[in-house]
């Protein structure tokens, strides 16, 4: 059966029936708008757009993978502000020939990723489309904490990361080479695994600037450097290159460090902390904030690279 057979309201009912609501949702799907509690009095909001052929391919990723990925990249933005995600809203553009099984898998992917952080899919919209288009808006609560923006890094602070780097880029390279059997690396492209708790955890540790690495470490740290009016120096010897990453690079004739520095969509967290802070695992110090501008990698030349939607 296809969603065209169900019709718009049949599709909406099918989606809503698979989505339990958490405590933050006072009124969920079914009315003109949802109502959420806001204990902190401030609401953190982020939105992202995913377009078939640009951000995912249905012949590479299942509906479930795509739902998990779309939720993850929005939930990680909320966590990167030091907030706890509470809900997401999903706008769907779908071709009429999409099967109900695929739709169920997509819905379950959204639901299961949200469940990792205690969030809910609290509403959304649906429309016909020539290709699959997903618009996701995520909300979060600061729990009385100050938000961690990109603008607080100062010379003398350390730069640390929490999460994997380069894995999604390596997985994409393997898929492009026809290596869909690329194991954990391909899975990292299909379904990133942000360490959500590290976002609010960093805020409690005193992080002065933070973001999630969606467009590549160099490019994203460049945003912190620009917003903070500082430079950042990275130590390449401190950057983690997993054995699987090194092996894939050998097979494809690539530089694994290039994946680590410029690969996007791992949604690791990168943050600046005062130099005297003792950071627990999984935080790993990889550089320092310096006077100046831009991001510099010791022993390497060139400009920061990464993902740009218009290049």
Task: Give the residues covered by each predicted segment.
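Small-aliphatic-rich amphipathic alpha-helix that forms the alpha element of a beta-alpha
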Residues: 63-87, 108-116, 200, 218-224
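Residue-level signal for inorganic ion chemistry
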Residues: 35, 74, 82, 121, ...
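Glycine-rich anion-binding loops of enzyme active sites
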Residues: 37-40, 50, 84-173, 288
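Extreme N-terminal cap/leader segments of soluble proteins
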Residues: 1-62, 81, 90, 109-113, ...
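Glycine-/charge-enriched secondary-structure boundary and capping motifs
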Residues: 1-20, 61, 95-120, 127-134, ...
